[in-house]
Amino acid sequence: MDTVSLEHQIQSVQRHISFLKKEQMALLRDLHLEILRLQKRCSELTHDLEMREAQSHQQEAASRELESKCRALESQLEARAAANAELRREVAQREALVSALRCSLRTEERRFLEELRRRSHRATVLGTELQKHTEAAAYLSCQLHAARQRLQAPRPGPGATAEPRPRRRALRARRPPAAHEAAAKGPGRDWAAWDRGAGALDDADPMPDPALFLYARRPLRPSARSPRQPPPQEPPDRAGPQPAPSQPSAPGDPE
């Protein structure tokens, strides 16, 4: 009985040992598979880490490149800001120059207008003086004509002493109005009345052209004369001695 029981115990132990071996082999296989899986996972993680490190290096290089580009752009921006400030200063200077030129142009325009006004006034004054001188020349030519007529008139005999009275009156009628009458009537009316009176007298005794007395006569050239033509006779107004007419101070002054 003891031997049978011992054999049964040995068999049971052997069965237990084989079972444990099987369990151990299964456990070892599972452990090996787990180790392989973990190794694969470690390799994957290592690869991921390496990729991430490479990406981080690339990102750092890209960030450094971007930083250098940003610095270059900042320097360009500063240069453009300085150029813009310089352009603003230049524009301000040109605006000041333009305003100064406008002021000088306005001053020159005002000065030109004043000079134009002054010259226009002087031209008016000179025109008035020229008109006065023309009237004085006409008056002097009338006096000269009257004096020549008096010199060329035949001297009356002893019995006809009363005839020159109308001539004196006619000469007095030729005189321009007096200064107080001219001031009372105005420069337009007195000369108009005097011209009408002188025109009425000139109808009876015409007066020569005043231009003959205002401009010197040009002598004729000897070559222009024909040998058959008679020599030019002296005009009657140069026949006798002529008194030099006294030039009045104003056309309205009496003789």
From Swiss-Prot:
Biased segments, Pro residues type: 242-255
Keywords linked to the UniProt accession: Coiled coil
Annotated InterPro entries: CCDC74A/CCDC74B/CCDC92, CCDC92/74_N
The keyword Coiled coil is annotated on this UniProt entry: yes
Positions in coiled-coil regions: 28-90
Any Pfam family matching the protein: CCDC92
Biased composition (Basic residues): 166-177
Highest taxon in the source lineage: Eukaryota
Region Disordered: start-end pairs: 149-255
Protein name: Coiled-coil domain-containing 92B
UniProt organism field: Homo sapiens
Lineage: Eukaryota, Metazoa, Chordata, Craniata, Vertebrata
